Amino acid sequence: MPNEQFLARQEDRRSGLRALRAALLKAHKELITLNRAEYERLYGPVPAGLFVQIVTEEPYFRWLDPLSRLIIEIDEELEAPEHHDQTCRAVAAATEKLFGPQSEPAFRERYQQALQDESGVIVAHGQLMKVIGQLKQLA
């Protein structure tokens, strides 16, 4: 039977992963909102139902795929019964890499532009960096 310290540590890790997921979702939402406005300036208004299809299929939004995949990986980890230090470190490192200078060029360029264009992206980025730091301390 797991001891209380182990269970508390597991809950800390789970909370950290949930916080990271929430911060990533916020950044994703801000980026989608910004890119929707840009897309609609170029191609005209898009109904909400069609927009979801456009985001998943249109090359204009492909640069967001690494972020979407990272969120999916965290979702899968949150479904696991236990969370390990290595996993928390790996997720924090993958997030830092994605949002850092060594990320994929297509993502980095568009993300840097979004940081310059939209205050909501800046706020989401700050929250994301804070959560990454907290998650690294748990690991």
Features from the language model and the residues they span:
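Surface-exposed peri-terminal alpha-helical interaction modules
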Residues: 1-139
